[in-house]
Amino acid sequence: MRPVDFTPSSESPTAEKGMKVVYFGNELPQDGIQGICRRLHTYTKDRRYPLLARFIEESTWAVHDEVRQLHAAQKALVSPFESVLHLAEQPELCRGPLCGSIEGVLLCVIQLGTFIGYYEDSPNEYTFDSANTYLTGLGLGLLASTAVSLSPTLADLPLAGAEVVRVAFRLGVLVADVSQNLQPADATGERDSWAYVIPNVAPKEAEEELAVIHTRENTPEASRIFISAISRTSVTISGPPARLRRLFRMSDFFRDRTFVALPVYGGLCHAKHIYNSQHARSVVQGPSIAALDTRFIARYPILSTGSGEPFPTATTATELFEHVMTEILTQAIEWENVIQGVVERAKLLSVSEVQVQVFRNSHPVHDLLSALETSLREGVEVAIKDLGPWITRTRDEERPPPRGTAQSKIAIVGMSCRMPSGATDTEKFWDILEQGLDVHRKIPPDRFDVDSHYDPAGKRVNASHTPYGCFIDEPGLFDAPFFNMSPREAQQTDPMQRLAIVTAYEALERAGYVANRTRSSNKHRMGTFYGQASDDYREVNSAQEISTYFIPGGCRAFGPGRINYFFKLWGPSFSIDTACSSSLATIQAACTALWNGDTDTVVAGGMNVLTNSDAFAGLSHGHFLTKTPNACKTWDCEADGYCRADGVASIVMKRLEDAEADNDNILGVILGAATNHSAEAISITHPHAGAQSCLSRQVLRSAGIDPMDVSYVEMHGTGTQAGDAEEIKSVSDVFAPAVKRRSSQQPVFIGAVKANVGHGEAVAGVTALVKVLLMFQKEAIPPHVGIKNSINPGFPKDLDQRNLRIPYEKKPWPRRPGRKRIAMVNNFSAAGGNSTLAIEEGPLRPKPAGAIDPRSSHLVTVSAKSKISLKGNLERLLSFLDAHPDVALSDLAYTTTARRHHHNHRVAVATSDIADLKAQLCKTLESDSVNTLQPISATGPPPIAFAFTGQGSSYKSWDLQLFQHSPYFRSQILHLDTLAQGQGFPSFVPAIDGSYPRDHAHCPVITQLALVCTEIALAKYWVSLGVTPDVVVGHSLGEYAALHIAGVLSASDAIFLVGQRACLLQERCQPSSHQMMAVRASLEQIEQFAGSLPYEIACVNGPREMVLSGTREEMAAVARLLEAEGFKCIVLEVAFAFHSAQMDPILDEFEALAASGVVFQAPNLPVISPLLSKVVFDEHTIDSVYMRRATRETVHFLSAMKMAHKISTIDDATVWVEIGPHPVCVNFVRSSLPSTSVTVPSFRRGEDNWVTLTSSLGILHCAGVPVDWNEFHQPFERALRLLDLPTYSWNEKTYWIQYQGNWALTKGNTFYDDEAPQTKALAGLASELRTSTVQQIIHEQYDGAAGSVVMQSDLMQPDFLAAAYGHKMNGRGVVTSSIHADIAFTLGEYLYKKLNPNQEPHMNIANLEVVKALVAQENTKSPQLIQVSASTDNIRSRQAHLKWHNVINGSIEEPFASATVYYEEASDWLASWRPATHLVQGRIHALEQLAEDGVANRFTRRMAYGLFASSLVDYADKYRGMQSVVLHELEAFADVVLTTEKGGTWTVPPYFIDSVAHLAGFIMNVSDANDTNANFCVTPGWSSMRFAAPLLPGSKYRSYVKMIPTVEDNNIYLGDVYILQDETIVGMVGGIKFRRYPRILLNRFFSAPDADARKSTPATSAPAPAPPAGSEALQPKAAPASTPAAPASADAPTTNGVKAAAEPDANSTAAKAIALVATEAGLGLSDLKDSASFSSLGIDSLMSLVISEKFRETLGVTVTGSLFLEYPTVGDLKSWLLEYYS
């Protein structure tokens, strides 16, 4: 073969041009090959580098194919790899027998990958041609150059390059096999070099010395050492490593030389005595190279590294590869020949520039450049282009979209959670983390009785060995109506599934999700993925009462399925169980769905609510759980297992590019996620550090992350000795290795959330993820609190040296420019699965420079599904604004409109500043308008009518902000203007764009075209916002725009008619000779007072809205007459008098133009015709004749409206939108159809367009019109940001089925049989009776006609507690007398039926007396028991007696309430009440009259209960039965409707009793007849309570009562509450008593029993809630031990034989106390002599309480209410005060 002659002639077009030399080296970069491969991997995900990605994919496939063909021993050396780039992550492979193959592959991949990527970035620089381009390289670099030589374009390079990579791998295998036969690999794994470089030695001398040695030692030919490379300053010798070492020991010539081992460990090349052309062919030939032959030939010459000449012409790719491979295997490298060849060709080409392209500088490159610079003529520029830095350059901040979904990063855009210990949102969860709290506690009673189900000894069957866990407070709380669930369905639905849908909603809300707003939020492309590993509630709670919803409410699949169904998501819903790693494995599955393109947005998370004691027992016996009181002692030396935990969390994920396009807040970005299994562990539950390490490396590889860039690892950290030790081994090995340690500036922190909130099992992974997201947000690492003693001894001892840190206190974790925070999250399964994900901080998204929202007014909306929630949402928004005073109003408007789902109860505020917004929101709340707002119709959006304004209200010139700011509106205007100019009319844009002042008049053509075209554009703008008309009407000139919107006229034809008509007017009519005049009078009135004068009726707009036309003189005359009669007349600013005789000259020609030049279509909307006073539906009515008549004849707007209403084209619900410059037509609509409810303008004269539009949009929104808010904000979205506003305010109630008894312990065994009697005594008798207030019968006994029954109930049980909190006083739930009544009705009926079976009693609950309030304690986690007994000596006496007791620490306290039940006949009651009926009715009528006269006060429901709450009692909604109240002094009646809302099990629901009876309390605490600021009144009971018929839900009643002070005590009031239905007395609460107390005592009487009332702030005149009940016997609590206690009564000082007390200093506490006593008792100081007894001074028990409270409040002296009994005289008190407070 002849050499290829690439030398151009002197005439060649390449002469005097530049020359390019591309050099591929033979050494891998020594400074971070892994980092380079990671960067290349990252570039392959970038859409800008498809060729690079294809090259890597093709190369990976090629190497996979070659590995498959290896023999078994070699194949076993290669671990699985996903990408050829990942081979760099296997250092053991690079040191093994195949090191030559791996290094060759990586070298070619890096160099060719860099070459391709560089030129994809700069495609214009890819200018190579065969005449002036030369390729060369050393060793394998020469092989890489063949790919470039064969590729005519850059697009061809990936396929040719992949073949180079394949051949490089084969070459390494061949060399390894051949070299192994020359010297086997060292058994110890030590690597020896096969080549040494020796500087300053002549090649000939070296060769002669080697020949001598070989001859002397009879070295076999194949084992001889040889010269493999020659350079100007050195030679390289190669051979078997052992012989090389021997050479340097034995040869004097070589021993005395400097020699350097080269990193050549794979074997020999450049050895012609070993290899031949057959070896070269064996490496090259194969099916893949043959495929290249069909399309590739050598394009650019490659210079031989032996001769320096181009390789011979190759007609196929195979031939070129064989040339190169033969050279690599058999020829020594002589770089000087290459240099000489390049220099000679540069001279022959007479180039002006030589560019040398390299991949980093090197000695050969340096020598080449030096030779070029010294050898070429002066003026020839020699340049080097280093392509290597392209890989490591700083990338653009603006991230390009990924190559495909598989290369996307995953953005987390929303999150929500319910965590233990009151963490009902992420902020409260962060508080727990930040404060370093451990929130474990004893298993609460709403799960199961921990005392009976816990056995620390582990001997009791099915019992737990631990009593501890971490629990969500009140997991049964749920807003069932919001999620369209009935109370029964809610109660039977697993609470974790309920909380999952709640947190899903909140996460989506925080993510700004609105269905179908963008491509990624399309409901068809969204799915749900949740982890769940238990079914406690189904197995235990709802299994006790299996019914309709047992399966859909309890089975796992329904959790995510219900979320999909509620949100109408069409994508997949997965419930995944991988035990403890369920939620993170689920999130990985969700990421995979996003990467695969299966979905565009997912809601994912995990859930766990613990109610089944079996799981505690099973995990205890499996040695999983700690027995000690802690969350998890993660990394502690005494870690003994984990603490179980509740938790529910949801996150919203989408691909990063979608999140950025959607303008989302990005909380964090998932870079990679994977799951594997600890298959090699010693048991299925035992962790395996190797598997964990492998998983971490896999995630890092796929994400292209350097482990040293990870600064935080959230570890699984369950707190077991084995688990903690294995995990720290894997984490330290990967992220803080002992070798290649982290720099001191680059620590990695570790943490574990389980130390705070326990192990949530199925929710553990997402809990950890939420923690990391919060850390990103808060820029802090919270303290780790798991190490209670000392660190686990199994941890590496060199953590500090490795720079691996445990944060024992909160650490800053700030953003840093140019370096993202990256964290890893581990979540492992007891079943052996491991899941890990890598996550980095979300990108900062500042508003772009210059991006502004120019709108002057904004609309803020708030909505809810209930009025209670609406109020809560308003309050939350106000709180947010208070906390964020600098919030941008535009962002707030955008968030609340375009990024929120809108419910049926709506509030909208149009405003220009935050202060005004807050004022309007406060006004809405304070005025109670929330309760009067009407929700939007459930039947769908209202019909919409567009009314197009005529010319009478138009400006002369406009300055439309909408034209300036709205691209859509502007484009419509400009398009219409183009149409107008195309028809020869002048541009009308100057008339609307602010070019002229408003009083500048334009010619009629411009004026009329401007009006009609603006209205057309405005109507289309409304339609673009989703406000689409169902019917149109146009007034006069406005009818042309209306006909276009209805489809009758094209825009071009409408412009033609308007423009031509205006031209005719200018030509045929005299401007201003005639006038149009609006008159505020009816037709009859005008006829009556001006009928004698000439005028024409131009418009009949309403009953009293007329427009007259005529000459100027005629109009002036008419105006004088009408104004004289008091009618308002306004001359319209129009040039012509339309609809009058002035139009006659143009009519014929105008009709002809319309007939010949215009196409009239059938309307696609009903058109209300003011000309015809009818609605047009057909295609024949509107034609050229119609247009003529409409110009000349009267506009009958009034009759047109009435006709349209009559035939139901419009109705009262129709929403009217005025399309025009000022609201005119909508006023006509209102006057014509007064029942019309909603009318809005588009523009208003003198008002900024945005002010008008936002106000109108708010009205439409509240009317139920579905506005496209996204479209409204879209032009300004670059300047807008989504705010993280408070989430929805739920109207929650408790839905919970309580696990009863101990059957989980006893099932299937006899272990507890012997304990049965004892258990029965403790747990109560089996009984069919169980209500919300009578929960457990603990004793019952019957003997003939005598009987007794005793029950115990826990006030902390959800329904009972809710009932108490339904009646709040002083901020606390109080057991109201109505609850006591329900208990009495229940036990009374039960006892009666036991003694008189099959009989139905009518009961009178009589003589109820409550001597001490029963107040709900603050600690809801421990029981608060009461015991009530009912007994009768003889049921035939028809009475039973009841007593109430508190049960404290198992002991029964003195009774605090009592009552008697009389069994009577309802007929007797009705008969006794009948005579009083007319008296009661008479008083009611009298009160009604007083109210009408303004003497009595009438209150709405909201007002009444608002006053009640501000005075004393805050009732829950169910208790608020009074719909209205009429009150005069101490007498009132109320109309009552009982709620239909269900909840709880009752005999007579307390909220029914209270609703019909608490009118008496309302009088006593609201009436201005009492001093309610200073006092409050509570009831200790009544004489009788009787209901002749059951109180029924939804029924209407009327209550009446008059309260009268008693003669004996003016602080006690009595009254009879009559309950009427249909004017018949059906019930009565007789002798109801109220006692008045000073308000200062409210806090003392109504504080939680487990709180020190005297340390809390005294109640003001507007107390918070608490239970009523006290009488004069109410007792204060004893003083705490820390206060100065009074001596025992036996030692109390007395006045007998005791000296007078020393006189205190005037400023002393004692003196102030005595002065206070005098003030409060109304005494003089002189009355308070030391010998005076307090009883003689009139200080009774009530006054004692008041003074005691004043002591505490004013002086800080804490005493009991019995102070004046213990110190009965003034002297006694002085002495005690001086002793303790002087």
UniProtKB/Swiss-Prot annotation:
Residues 1704-1781 form the Carrier domain. Disruption phenotype: Impairs the production of trypacidin and pathway intermediates including questin. Leads to enhanced phagocytosis ratio by macrophages and amoebae. Residues 407-841 form the Ketosynthase family 3 (KS3) domain. Gene3D superfamilies: 3.30.70.3290, 3.40.47.10, ACP-like, Malonyl-Coenzyme A Acyl Carrier Protein, domain 2, Polyketide synthase dehydratase. The modification O-(pantetheine 4'-phosphoryl)serine is found at residue 1741. Keywords: Multifunctional enzyme, Phosphopantetheine, Phosphoprotein, Transferase. Multidomain protein; including a starter unit:ACP transacylase (SAT) that selects the starter unit; a ketosynthase (KS) that catalyzes repeated decarboxylative condensation to elongate the polyketide backbone; a malonyl-CoA:ACP transacylase (MAT) that selects and transfers the extender unit malonyl-CoA; a product template (PT) domain that controls the immediate cyclization regioselectivity of the reactive polyketide backbone; and an acyl-carrier protein (ACP) that serves as the tether of the growing and completed polyketide via its phosphopantetheinyl arm. This is Atrochrysone carboxylic acid synthase.
